[in-house]
Regions:
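Flavin-dependent oxidoreductase catalytic core characteristic
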Residues: 1-169
Length: 169
């Protein structure tokens, strides 16, 4: 939120920072979240220890993601199986991190992986439904890009965009 509000101020050339528009209020509100909630790492630790460690929300999340993949019969089986595997790995990693206080250093990575895998599953589920209605499979491609760019390890010596990805975009 802070980045978006800051970019909005820059787009207006700084105009709006002093109460001409709603932007300064939005910027202040965006900063309040991190002030009240704490840094991303603290929020990640809290989310894992409470949601996963105490309340078992990881099981509900995994069940929902698997159900969405099961509902996506028109999505290629290989892609659904890959997402099932990544879902299980992300949930397992979150459980491992939540299981011991010594693992707090990995909390941000665990919550980010859960987020990215859940996003890819949601995009796949939506993409399958949209493809059935309109023949548009772009969300399936976006799901693939989320996994490629946010979950799978990248080679720092490789171009950021492959030939396949250039065709997609």
């Amino acid at each position: 939120a802070r980045k978006v509000c800051g970019d909005a101020l820059e787009m207006r050339g700084g105009i709006g920072y002093i109460e001409e528009f709603a932007t300064p209020r939005l910027l202040r509100d965006a900063h309040l979240g991190s002030i009240w909630e704490g840094t991303g790492n603290i929020v990640a630790i809290d989310a894992l220890t409470r949601a996963v460690g105490r309340h078992g929300a990881d099981s509900a999340l995994a069940a929902d993601l698997h159900a969405r993949l099961n509902e996506s019969a028109n999505v290629p089986v290989a892609w659904r199986n890959r997402l099932r595997e990544l879902t299980d790995r992300a949930v397992g990693f979150a459980r491992e991190v939540a299981g011991r206080i010594d693992n707090e250093g990995d909390a941000r990575r665990a919550t980010s992986l859960l987020y990215h895998v859940a996003s890819a599953v949601a995009l796949t589920w939506e993409g399958g439904r949209i493809h059935e209605m309109r023949g548009d499979a772009r969300r399936l491609l976006l799901a693939r890009m989320v996994i490629d760019h946010r979950v799978l390890p990248g080679d720092p010596f490789q171009l950021a965009e492959t030939a396949t990805q250039r065709k997609i975009t």
